Regions:
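Beta-propeller blade termini and top-face loops
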Residues: 1-469
Length: 469
């Protein structure tokens, strides 16, 4: 448990949970619990718990944050440190022949400090370790993740955020272009003590699309996995998910298969790949069906029935998985809508959604209105029916004009040029009697839009039209 490197918060866990009935029930291991809350010991933040498949289930390895690698040989009753490091990021895997690999970034969380142990390490017994770090990996490396090659237990893939080294990708964050560098290696063990590294960083996915480049948000979302059915089918993930069918030996055979997507329509700056979600954390291949793969990300769990398809299709498996968090909700409060069951709401990391069912709102699917982190949203009088204001993070506000049947006539972006320092979920409110007027907080000022109808339909960016402060 514990998340040391969240997008918006650092959340202390409290130890490790164990199940002895195939995941039906879970119990905390007393040896990993902290006497204080929030927890401060070595198990307050863990990156991975690994049961050794070739030993019995009593042998478990745990990669921690700032406390290195720990091992238990008695099912968690007691733990022994086997590889110390104060690195913020760590990982551990085991190959099909029982060889263990551990990784530590050089980043400690303190600017300028270098971890006491960083790089990639190999062990055949879990107690003695050999440093096999790629020779061109530098002590600026941040997060490192590892993947076995199931068909070839002498091989692994290594993906890392490597500032100023490797493939340079960009994204748009708070209206500004941001850059990150990542590196990808393949390691082949050639003898008991030696191996060779192949740097495949030049083939990390990059596109000409907004939010199409490989980008991991400082290592927050970072994964690499190899299919157990085909050693050339390799998946990498950051904000987006990508598939290669030649092990990233070239730039010709990879596809963008999840996460963000090309802005459609152009005003939706946070369009998502259909039936998928940004910020990738893991994938799992089906053990017997070579086409089926599960994807875990900030939106939950998704599955595809054909990972090799030219256009990969996903199914959402989050029904009944009750983690949705609404920042705001609104219901119609206008003449003619007194008995309406319509609802609109902005969800944490899950867009703005709208329920348009007048009969039974508990059974009709909701409709996605806009992307990003859903924020303040309102029903208002407008046109021949009702209209909508909705917003996403950092003060982006939109207006949807509906026709007499309630169908969308047009939409436009309406937030003002000028304010820079918005709250992440930034408030604004329509005037109670003139709902073409809204008031909005921005920086240390109050802004007023005098008439939303002045802004042209289809506008896709911030505007000066109609605003004063």
């Amino acid at each position: 448990t514990g998340e040391i490197y969240g997008n918006s918060a650092q959340i202390s866990g409290n130890g490790i949970l164990k199940s002895t009935d195939n995941g039906v029930t879970w119990s905390p291991l007393p040896s990993t619990l902290s006497a204080s809350i929030p927890a401060t010991h070595q198990f307050a933040y863990t990156w991975r718990a690994l049961v050794h498949p070739q030993r019995d289930s009593q042998q478990v390895y745990v990669a921690t944050s700032r406390a290195g690698l720990y091992r238990t040989t008695n099912g968690g009753s007691a733990w022994t440190p086997v590889l110390s490091s104060n690195a913020l990021f760590s990982d551990v895997i085991v190959t099909r022949n029982g060889t263990l690999y551990a990784a530590f970034g050089a980043f400690t969380g303190t600017q300028g400090a270098i971890a006491s142990r960083w790089g990639v390490f190999r062990s055949t017994n879990g107690t003695t370790w050999t440093n096999v770090t790629p020779p061109d990996m530098k002590n600026t490396v941040k997060r490192i993740v590892l993947a076995e090659v199931p068909q070839h237990p002498e091989q692994i893939f290594v993906l890392a955020e490597t500032p100023d080294e490797g493939a340079k990708g960009s994204t748009i964050y708070r209206g500004e272009e941001r850059f990150e560098w990542h590196s990808l290696w393949k390691y082949t063990r050639t003898s008991a003590d030696t191996g060779t590294w192949e740097n495949r960083s030049a083939n990390i996915p990059m596109t000409d699309e907004q939010r199409g480049d490989f980008y991991s948000q400082g290592g927050y979302d970072l994964l690499v996995k190899v299919s157990p059915h085909d050693s050339n089918l390799v998946i990498v993930g950051g904000t987006n998910l990508y598939r290669s069918t030649d092990g990233f030996t070239s730039t010709k055979n990879w596809k963008w298969i999840g996460g963000y997507w090309k802005p459609t329509p152009s005003f939706d700056k946070y369009s998502s790949y259909k039936d998928h979600h940004p910020d990738q954390h893991d994938v799992l291949f089906h053990p017997t069906d070579p086409k089926q793969m599960y994807s875990a990300n900030d939106g939950g769990v998704y599955v595809t029935d054909d990972i090799r398809a030219d256009s990969v299709a996903w199914r959402d498996l989050n029904r009944g998985y009750l983690t949705t968090q609404f920042y705001t909700v609104d219901i119609p409060n206008m003449p003619g809508f007194e008995t309406s069951r319509k609802i609109i709401g902005g969800m944490q990391d899950n867009s703005v959604w709208f329920q348009n069912d007048e009969e039974e709102p508990t059974t009709t699917p909701w409709q996605r209105v806009g992307g990003g982190d859903g924020a303040y949203s309102y029903f208002v009088t407008g046109g021949l029916s009702y209209s909508l204001y909705y917003s996403s993070q950092q003060g982006r506000v939109y207006y949807v004009r509906n026709g007499i049947t309630g169908k969308e006539s047009y939409r436009k972006r309406i937030d003002p040029i000028g304010p820079k320092d918005y709250l992440f979920i930034n408030p604004y409110v329509p005037h109670p009697t003139d709902q073409n007027t809204i008031y909005m907080a921005g920086d240390n000022q109050l802004w007023r839009l005098n008439d939303v109808d002045l802004i042209p339909a289809g506008n896709t960016d911030s505007t000066l039209i109609g605003w004063d402060s």
